[in-house]
Amino acid sequence: MRTHYCSAVNELSLDKQITVCGWVHNRRDHGGVIFLDIRDRSGLLQVVYEPENKEIFAIAEKLRSEFVVRVTGIVRKRPEGMINDKMETGRVEVIGTQLEILNQSPTPPFLPDDHQVINEDLRYKYRYIDLRRAVMQKKLTLRHKLNSCIRNYLNEQNFLDIETPMLTKATPEGARDYLVPSRVHPGQFYALPQSPQLFKQLLMMSGFDKYYQIVRCFRDEDLRADRQPEFTQLDIEMAFINEEDILQLIEGLLKIVFKEILNITLPDKLPRMPYKEAMTRYGSDKPDLRNPLELIDIADLVKNCDFNVFASAANDNSGRVVALKLPNGCDLSRKDLDNYGQFVTIYGAKGLAYIKVNDLSAGMAGLQSPILKFLSETAVQSILNRVEVQTGDVIFFGADKAHVVNESMGALRNKLGHDRNLINSGWQLLWVVDWPMFELDPQSNKLQPMHHPFTSPQELSAEALRSKPTQTLAKAYDIVINGYEIGGGSIRIHQPELQKTVFDLIGIDEQEAHEKFGFLLDALQYGAPPHGGIALGIDRLAMLLTDSTSIRDVIAFPKTQTASCPLTSAPSPAGNAQLTELGIRLAPTITTK
């Protein structure tokens, strides 16, 4: 039907007859001549129809935006003064000799033009029009290239692409499952997988020592700004390996991805940072190292001060007091400071103390803060020295339980970095390693795994794990790019007794363990090899590589923030006949006034 994509028509095609198919992007009438910009996924091509061919010219006059056409013509150089170097095909044009309207279009709700600002709901309702925009075509094409890079690299490393079930058993993995009722087993349900975690471990026990899959996963999570109920991850598992093998594999993969897609050369070895250091310096387990701001502990300097907010946190074993210096921050207004104070309350902080350093040489007289009256001059000077302030700086303080300080001041660090344009350009990748095996749930005070219950501790002793669970480190690792967690993984437990110990510590008794994970515990008894793996978020990685602001921009048909699809109106009610066949009766909806 066509001989060329639009962008393939160039000066090598001069004087040749070509045929292209696509959409009418633009139509212009100039001096009795009709100019068309024809668009396909590769780009734009200018076609000229002259009035001498009355029959074809009459068809061209009928064309409107988004008509679908088939165009045949002769390629020629554009006249001097008509060259457009902003277009890939801007040095040539096609003199149309044939024209066929393949389909018509009414005036669309918006034109697929990158220069328009389009309401997001409208974009998703008419996603098939939105995806015609050049920027969207480029993003999804880059995503395809990303997947191709991944497959080529792993295939060369002797990995096998093996599919795992989509209809599986509900297992606790940190979020709610999407349940699928079984018609042939009334009252029973499948679960859509939150990840292929257990199946890929079973593949290692089956002798497939190198597995990968680019796979859809499903999580019925609470609504958050940039989460999708269904998402895509690169899932990897290997047997007879250690942590170093996984890290080197992923470093090699990312090196190829960045080179082939962005022409950026990454170092052979990425920096590594222990989890404890990341939380101490940045208040985050996914620090953006492009941001120069850091948290500085000052608890030892304020233990005996008269400011109870500082003193109580400093003398609490689970408390923390930190300072965060903002260079040249004295220009912040009272309203700005109040807004930042309100911001940290979102993360559980009760407020935000600060000191403005208007004139460092003037001593206490050169400082401005509501808390100065509670602090001795010695304590203040010690803080200023440790934080290494200069005239014009402002210091923010966080004092509370350590988890509140980390979350609130880590978020403030990120916000200040963006608000004050402190984020350096470029790419900062790092591994966060040496994670705690468990954390205490602040509500229930029960142990819960930091990653998942199949992660191996660094010390492979059930007795040691029971004696000091909160001090035990895991063989776990996350890859972070520019402040985004792109992936995480671990070495897995391959000894049945150690796995039972972990289940017991997190409150899964023997009966529940066998009901939910009996198949895994059985498999572990039959010669399970040491194994481990990782999963990378394809959506988020594609978002970063395309410089997008949302993962929805790199997903062809995303859900909205309310987990709905304006295009198809999903989710939607099921018919009574279908519900009856499935043995489901809906409970009445209870509304509260």
Curated annotation (Swiss-Prot):
InterPro entries assigned to the protein according to its UniProt record, in alphabetical order: Aa-tRNA-synt_II, aa-tRNA-synth_II, aa-tRNA-synth_II/BPL/LPL, Asp-tRNA-ligase_1, Asp-tRNA-ligase_1_N, Asp/Asn-tRNA-synth_IIb, AspRS_core, GAD-like_sf
Enzyme class name: ligase
Positions bound to ATP: 219-221, 228, 485, 537-540
Site description Important for tRNA non-discrimination, residues in chain: 30, 81
A GO molecular-function annotation: ATP binding
Amino-acid positions noted as binding L-aspartate in the UniProt annotation, renumbered to this chain: 173, 219, 451, 492
Pfam families (alphabetical): GAD (PF02938), tRNA-synt_2 (PF00152), tRNA_anti-codon (PF01336)
Principal place of residence: cytoplasm
Substrates-to-products reaction catalysed: tRNA(Asx) + L-aspartate + ATP = L-aspartyl-tRNA(Asx) + AMP + diphosphate
Region annotated Aspartate, chain positions: 197-200
Any GO CC annotation of this UniProt entry: cytoplasm
Subcellular location field: Cytoplasm
UniProt superkingdom: Bacteria
Keywords linked to the UniProt accession: Aminoacyl-tRNA synthetase, ATP-binding, Cytoplasm, Ligase, Nucleotide-binding, Protein biosynthesis
Database matches in NCBIfam families: aspS_bact, PRK00476.1
Similarity-based family: Belongs to the class-II aminoacyl-tRNA synthetase family. Type 1 subfamily.
PANTHER family in UniProt: ASPARTATE--TRNA LIGASE, MITOCHONDRIAL, ASPARTYL/LYSYL-TRNA SYNTHETASE
Subunit composition and interactions: Homodimer.
Protein's name according to its UniProt entry: Aspartate--tRNA(Asp/Asn) ligase
Record organism: Legionella pneumophila (strain Lens)
